[in-house]
Amino acid sequence: MYVLENGDPQAPPVLLLHGGGVAGWMWRPTLDRLGGAARVIVPDLPGHGNSAGETYRSHAETARALAEVLEERAPRGALVAGFSLGAQLTTLLAATRPDLVTGAVVVSAQARPLRFPGTTLGLLSAAAPLARQRWFARLQAKELFVPAELLDDYIRDSALVSRATLLASVGENIRFTLPAGWSRFENPALVMVGERERTLMRNSALDTHGALPGSRMISVPGCGHGIPLQRPDLFAEILAEQL
């Protein structure tokens, strides 16, 4: 798994986990605003970006690989923040390896499985070739609130995502339920959701918050499914507060 690390080696470590269909570059606006407040660890998840050569297989396998990254780069633990698919992985890491997670920021994690995942995945498989078309990638980028300066990154990486990675990652995403260990996580946890996200996502945030006593929840006004890209200023400020 490709991992980018930068920032002050003596600063508190932060592991940032991107969403599906994008890559570590989605955190660039946040990093620009975070400055030297953190030592940032940014992987490209399997099947994405610079890790496109590795097929995404499952959340469990990816969480184990991320735990190995933390064992090597932040053995005393790190603040873990994830968006969408990356937010699901954040809850999984917190549940299974709380010794490596000093705090969790869970942004827009779906925590209620879809009723008919097979139908969704069938349609997705049929539409997969469209991801390699620039016009379609541009439409998707708009839905994901990708800013103009990151559009080329999105178009490039969309074409790199294999059908196997697409189906595996989305399949895991739409079947996801909160791991049992999440309710026992003892370190600080913040759940975030956009005020304009779908009802499913807002309810998922309530579930995630409700399942963990002592967690906090923020609904961000004016935001859809794209808080780190829509409000990188706010997101960087929140990360700095969690350190």
PLM segments and residue spans:
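Flexible "cap/lid" loop of the alpha/beta hydrolase fold
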Residues: 91-96, 100-131
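Active-site loop/oxyanion-hole signature of alpha/beta-hydrolase fold enzymes
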Residues: 29, 39-81, 237
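Conserved alpha/beta-hydrolase catalytic His-Asp/Glu region
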Residues: 115-117, 131-183
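Acidic catalytic loop of the alpha/beta-hydrolase fold
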Residues: 196-200
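Catalytic histidine-centered segment of alpha/beta-hydrolase-like enzymes
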Residues: 223-236
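Conserved HGGG/HGGXW glycine-rich cap/lid loop of the alpha/beta-hydrolase fold
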Residues: 2-52
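Gly/Ala-rich beta-loop-alpha elbow adjacent to hydrolase catalytic centers
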Residues: 82-86, 90
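Short beta-strand/loop motif that positions the catalytic acidic residue
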Residues: 185, 191-193
